[in-house]
Amino acid sequence: MPKQKVAILGPGSWGTALAQVLNDNGHEVRLWGNIPEQINEINTNHTNSHYFKDIVLDEAIKATLDLKEALADADAILFVVPTKVTRLVAKQVAQVLDHKAVVMHASKGLEPGTHERLSTILEEEISAQLRSEIVVVSGPSHAEETIVRDITLITAASKDITAAKYVQALFSNHYFRLYTNTDVIGVETAGALKNIIAVGAGALHGLGYGDNAKAAVITRGLAEITRLGVKLGADPLTYSGLSGVGDLIVTGTSVHSRNWRAGAALGRGEKLKDIESNMGMVIEGISTTKVAYEIAQELGVYMPITSAIYKSIYEGADIKESILGMMSNEFRSENEWHS
């Protein structure tokens, strides 16, 4: 692929790791953020120490506080900002972007209030500047592993297969490989909802339960993710792929996962506000739990794990009692994933 200019909006851990992937592939990368100290550190020291203490970035990776500068002549734009500010940043992009570009996002969440997927938000806010359909970049991927060039396989999903293949070629190399998919609903819901299950798996660990319990919550969590996704129009097969079960495994079993760590802390009895303060990073699973619970209630979808996590976080229920309460739920067939 010829050299491309890519603007990455959000110099967090994942945005920085993806910047390195693109730089390794010979593309021109510009990171945009709004914290002067961080931007200066990336440009001066070639580090992003808040996320990666021992990683030195290539000097070719540049960062800026100026959104217009970041977007100038960009062939592709990658959103990697927290879900809650995606619409705000998209509005800002729409005001300064003066040409059409391929727009991607690599965030995982659902917008509070509207319940919208992130691709829908981007379509609504910057439709005039889209060169193609939105492309979703999602899958089992710890930034801590990608940044050291560990093998990573994820998904590029778009209703426009040509756009998905463009992004596949843009990112893929000897350690980072993308597979295409046209089921945007499935890929986005899988990426968002697995964070809830990761909180649950972490909570089990914090409470002292073993691998049997963790395997159960991950497996039954996949069932309820699939139930809701299919109700929203997804292909159930998507949930058996990289962006589904793959992402659920990596997020629901690893200390690298901030959602898992948050759940573990909740299980140990720590307060949510203290957990968020100590992490210093967005825990998407917390807000996604509320959105998913509201959607499930509205559509009548059975999501017992999501409900248990919701009641613990938002209604003050004891997390151990909420989880153990599921053991007395009505008997069901394992094959009732769709009901």
UniProtKB/Swiss-Prot annotation:
Primary localization: cytoplasm
GO cellular component, one term: cytosol
EC top class named in words: oxidoreductase
Coiled coil keyword on record: no
Ligand binding (NADPH): 13-14, 108, 143, 258, 282, 284
Alphabetic keyword roster: Cytoplasm, Lipid biosynthesis, Lipid metabolism, NAD, NADP, Nucleotide-binding, Oxidoreductase, Phospholipid biosynthesis, Phospholipid metabolism
Pathway(s) served: Membrane lipid metabolism; glycerophospholipid metabolism
EC number: 1.1.1.94
InterPro entries referenced in this protein's UniProt entry, alphabetically: 6-PGluconate_DH-like_C_sf, 6PGD_dom2, G3P_DH_NAD-dep, G3P_DH_NAD-dep_C, G3P_DH_NAD-dep_N, NAD(P)-bd_dom_sf
Active site: 194 (proton acceptor)
One annotated GO molecular function: NAD binding
Localization terms from the record: Cytoplasm
Pfam families cross-referenced by the UniProt entry: NAD_Gly3P_dh_C (PF07479), NAD_Gly3P_dh_N (PF01210)
Catalytic activity: sn-glycerol 3-phosphate + NAD(+) = dihydroxyacetone phosphate + NADH + H(+); sn-glycerol 3-phosphate + NADP(+) = dihydroxyacetone phosphate + NADPH + H(+)
Keyword set includes rRNA processing: no
Protein residues bound to sn-glycerol 3-phosphate: 108, 139, 141, 194, 247, 257-259
Domain of life according to the entry: Bacteria
GO biological process: carbohydrate metabolic process; glycerol-3-phosphate biosynthetic process; glycerol-3-phosphate catabolic process; glycerophospholipid metabolic process; phospholipid biosynthetic process
Family per similarity comment: Belongs to the NAD-dependent glycerol-3-phosphate dehydrogenase family.
Alphabetized HAMAP family for the sequence: NAD_Glyc3P_dehydrog
Summary of the function given for this chain in its UniProt record: Catalyzes the reduction of the glycolytic intermediate dihydroxyacetone phosphate (DHAP) to sn-glycerol 3-phosphate (G3P), the key precursor for phospholipid synthesis.
Protein name: Glycerol-3-phosphate dehydrogenase [NAD(P)+]
Species name: Streptococcus equi subsp. zooepidemicus (strain MGCS10565)
Primary gene name: gpsA
